[in-house]
C-alpha cells in the first residue's frame, strides 16, 4: 500500500513540476521575466513571481495543473480563501523587497494535460 502512495505522490509532484515549467515558458513568451519559482515562507508558497519590466508590474502566479476536469475548472480551483492567501503571501514578499512596483497583479495559470498529453494552458490575469 505504501508503494502505491509514494508512486501516486511522485506522479503528482512530477505533474506539478511539468505544469510550472510550462507556465514559466508561457510567461516568458509573453515578455515577462521570472524572478522566483516556488518562493516559500512560513505561511505558504508562491509558485511563480514574475515581472514586466516595461510596465514595472510584478505578477504573482498560482499554477494549477490537472489531468482532467474532475475537480472543476480553473475558476473553481481558486477559491476566495486561496485568493486571500495569495494576497497575504504577495504582501510578505513585497515587504522584503527594495524595489517599488508601479502595479501588482495576481494571476492563475491552468495547465490541463489530457489523454493526448498535449497541454492546454489557460491564463487568468488579475484575479485578485
UniProtKB/Swiss-Prot annotation:
Pfam families: UPF0102. One of its GO terms (molecular function) is nucleic acid binding. It comes from the Bacteria. Belongs to the UPF0102 family. This is UPF0102 protein MAV_3752. The lineage of its organism: Bacteria, Bacillati, Actinomycetota, Actinomycetes, Mycobacteriales.
Amino acid at each position: 500500500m505504501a508503494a502505491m502512495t509514494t508512486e501516486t505522490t511522485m506522479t503528482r509532484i512530477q505533474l506539478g513540476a511539468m505544469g510550472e515549467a510550462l507556465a514559466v515558458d508561457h510567461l516568458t513568451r509573453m515578455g515577462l521575466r521570472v524572478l522566483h519559482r516556488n518562493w516559500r515562507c512560513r505561511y505558504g508558497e508562491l509558485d511563480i513571481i514574475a515581472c514586466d519590466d516595461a510596465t514595472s508590474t510584478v505578477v504573482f502566479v498560482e499554477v494549477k495543473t490537472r489531468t482532467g476536469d474532475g475537480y472543476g475548472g480553473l475558476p473553481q480551483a481558486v477559491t476566495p480563501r486561496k485568493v486571500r492567501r495569495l494576497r497575504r503571501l504577495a504582501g510578505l514578499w513585497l515587504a522584503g523587497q527594495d524595489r517599488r512596483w508601479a502595479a501588482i497583479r495576481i494571476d492563475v495559470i491552468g495547465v490541463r494535460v489530457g489523454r493526448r498529453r498535449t497541454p492546454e494552458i489557460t491564463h487568468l490575469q488579475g484575479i485578485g
